[in-house]
């Protein structure tokens, strides 16, 4: 049957990467995998039109992907990339309306079975495709209720106020946004990007929204690191050095153990305050700062590391966590967001949200356990191969197609 994908934002909905297994484009990966099962009519922003049209003829499923472009200005594109720039939503709303008008024209000319609002994953701007007289699918959607404020203790005043304001606005929008309500009501199915989003849809809209994290991976064969059986325990931390990522928790957890044989490798932009913290805690010799490095170099570090230490408390489903699993790397993280759903007890260890100090203690306890039980570490690494298949793009696409079939069977 024909299915119609409608997606955004600029760049990420359309950006083709030469190596799909390391692509940053969530929507592109959805498209190339769904196109193995469906005929896709795709509306997207046009910055990477040349790259899209160059690669389509090289893909076996490319003949099933029909692109329509709704470009925006360079100014709006910059706003899209500048996360936190709320001005973007004004332009995004206009883009969604134009997309709706384009969709109306396509429906007249093409046989369309399903309309799918795929991207962006945020719930705040549901677009207008639900107004079309076609079965409507929305998601995966990120509708987390709020940022965990217990972790604001060490935040700067500006960040503290911004996050509390955002929590308040999120609550208001979940309760009162009429277009969100209309989109949910019209949808034949809404998929949740995380367990927290599932809870929000149940609480505010009284629907069951099946869990389907928004990103996937491409399983690969990686030799398991033999150094896991002895010697130093090498932890890898990768991320943007901002407040959400909570790097201080990782540094303090290492200091809490007072074990010089536990090393923390840190990949991310320069921030002297974090290096200063390591000095104050007398663990500078245990922290290896790699700075900003290439994606390939990150993969090399993952293949050498023993544990991927992910301390973020506010995410969608971070691709870097799936990359860790792809490298047979055990993950320690919070049981929250998409990474909490992606990591199960076979491939990692999760701790609950609590307070910063309790989290430091919990992380330290788990790391010490793994330091002393290398057999557990090795077994979890071996288990990653099965989890790769479960989280693969191929499996994600099949789950979505199953939902399409269910929707059409009810028409």
Give short role names for the model-derived ranges:
Residues 59, 275-296:
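Nucleotide-activated donor-binding/catalytic signature segment of Leloir-type glycosyltransferases, i.e.
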Residues 65-69, 138, 169-224:
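Donor nucleotide-sugar binding/catalytic pocket of nucleotide-sugar-dependent glycosyltransferases
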Residues 321, 330-333:
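Short hydrophobic beta-strand element within catalytic cores of glycosyltransferases
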Residues 25, 233, 240-256:
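A conserved mid-protein helix/loop that constitutes part of the nucleotide-sugar donor-binding site
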Residues 184, 292-293, 300-305:
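Short alpha-helical donor nucleotide-sugar binding micro-motif in glycosyltransferases
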Residues 313:
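Aromatic "clamp/platform" in nucleotide-sugar-dependent glycosyltransferases that forms part
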Residues 238, 263-276, 291:
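Glycosyltransferase donor-sugar binding loop
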């Amino acid at each position: 049957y024909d299915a119609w994908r409608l997606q955004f934002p600029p760049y990420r909905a359309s950006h083709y990467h030469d190596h799909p297994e390391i692509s940053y484009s969530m929507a592109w990966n959805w498209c190339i995998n769904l196109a193995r099962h469906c005929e896709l009519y795709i509306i997207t922003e046009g910055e990477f039109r040349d790259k899209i049209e160059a690669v389509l003829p090289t893909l076996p499923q490319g003949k099933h992907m029909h692109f329509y472009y709704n470009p925006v200005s360079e100014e709006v594109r910059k706003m899209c990339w500048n996360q936190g720039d709320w001005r973007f939503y004004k332009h995004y709303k206009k883009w969604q309306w134009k997309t709706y008008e384009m969709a109306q024209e396509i429906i007249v000319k093409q046989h369309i079975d399903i309309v799918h609002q795929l991207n962006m994953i945020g719930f705040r701007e549901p677009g207008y495709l639900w107004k079309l007289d076609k079965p409507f699918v929305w998601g995966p959607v990120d509708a987390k209720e709020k940022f965990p404020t217990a972790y604001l203790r060490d935040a700067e005043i500006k960040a503290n106020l911004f996050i509390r304001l955002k929590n308040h606005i999120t609550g208001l929008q979940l309760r009162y946004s009429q277009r969100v309500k209309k989109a949910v009501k019209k949808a034949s199915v809404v998929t949740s990007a995380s367990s927290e989003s599932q809870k929000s849809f149940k609480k505010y809209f009284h629907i069951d929204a099946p869990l389907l994290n928004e990103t996937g991976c491409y399983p690969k064969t990686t030799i398991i690191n033999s150094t896991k059986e002895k010697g130093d325990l090498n932890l890898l931390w990768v991320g943007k050095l901002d407040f959400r990522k909570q790097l201080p928790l990782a540094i303090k957890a290492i200091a809490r153990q007072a074990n010089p044989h536990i090393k923390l490798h840190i990949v991310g932009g320069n921030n002297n305050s974090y290096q200063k913290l390591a000095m104050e805690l007398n663990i500078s010799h245990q922290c290896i700062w790699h700075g900003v490095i290439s994606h390939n170099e990150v993969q090399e570090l993952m293949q050498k590391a023993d544990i991927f230490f992910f301390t973020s408390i506010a995410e969608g489903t971070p691709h870097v966590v799936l990359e860790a699993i792809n490298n047979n790397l055990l993950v320690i993280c919070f049981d929250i967001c998409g990474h909490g759903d992606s990591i199960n007890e076979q491939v990692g260890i999760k701790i609950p949200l609590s307070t910063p100090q309790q989290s430091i203690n919990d992380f330290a306890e788990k790391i010490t356990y793994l330091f002393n039980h290398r057999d557990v570490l090795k077994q979890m690494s071996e288990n990653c191969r099965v989890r790769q298949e479960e989280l693969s793009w191929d499996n994600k696409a099949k789950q979505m197609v199953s939902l399409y079939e269910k929707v059409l069977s009810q028409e």
